[in-house]
Amino acid sequence: MYVFCICDLSKRFSLSFQPNFLCELGLQKQGFFHVAGVDEVGRGPLAGPVVTAAVILDKDRIPDGLNDSKKLSFLQRNRLYHEILQSALAASIASLCARTIDQSNIRKATLEAMRRCIIGLAVPAHYVLVDGRDIPSELPCPAMALIKGDQRSVSIAAASIIAKVTRDRMMECAGQVYTNYGLEKHVGYATLAHRRALDKYGPIVGLHRYSFAPLKERYRNDVS
């Protein structure tokens, strides 16, 4: 039986410094040699998929500058994206679309995408560190949820970068198809420009999340 736990490191430690590899090293000393960090991007937007990534870093080839993707510039994220994919022992990405999110809910969709990217790793994980409070079910190995994990673990930080860059690129592609919404700029979040485009053109079936406010009440009858 695997042990799953939640660890709120933010209550014990200051989060003002860079994430590190200490948690992974501790697990490796216990025999969990392949430790995967897992994170998601896209829980809150009105449009687009939720994207998750799992990364197993090589302890001897950890890219410099790994941090929570939200704290990095566009150029930093894209540089690290390539460095992570080149140096990691394994990396995996999974996403679930707006329709699936509407059919279940964002929490369930996120956890399912996390589960898929974990089992999709080319090198099987011996242990998984998941950012946040929730752990996917039916995993092939033990797991720990780390609150603010992307600020503590470089493996989770690496996963956050892979997920962020991947999702941003997906939304940029969507913006080339649906040119009136500015998707390449706000990547689906509820900015003023996005809400104005929704008022003018309406939501895009298959891309917008009809289960999210403010779309839920206004357009719920539009979904077949």
UniProtKB/Swiss-Prot annotation:
Top-level taxonomic group: Bacteria
GO molecular function: manganese ion binding; RNA binding; RNA-DNA hybrid ribonuclease activity
Alphabetically ordered keywords of this record: Cytoplasm, Endonuclease, Hydrolase, Manganese, Metal-binding, Nuclease
Domain RNase H type-2, first and last residues per copy: 33-224
Enzyme class: hydrolase
Cofactor: Mn(2+); Mg(2+)
SUPFAM superfamilies per the UniProt record, alphabetical: Ribonuclease H-like
Keyword Transmembrane recorded: no
Binding locations of a divalent metal cation: D39, E40, D131
Gene Ontology BP terms: DNA replication, removal of RNA primer; mismatch repair
Entries under CDD domains matching the protein: RNase_HII_bacteria_HII_like (cd07182)
Localisation per UniProt entry: Cytoplasm
PROSITE patterns: RNASE_H_2 (PS51975)
Record flagged with keyword Phosphoprotein: no
GO CC, alphabetical: cytoplasm; ribonuclease H2 complex
EC number from the UniProt entry: 3.1.26.4
UniProt record similarity statement: Belongs to the RNase HII family.
Its job: Endonuclease that specifically degrades the RNA of RNA-DNA hybrids.
Record NCBIfam families: PRK00015.1-3
Name the record gives this protein: Ribonuclease HII
Gene: rnhB
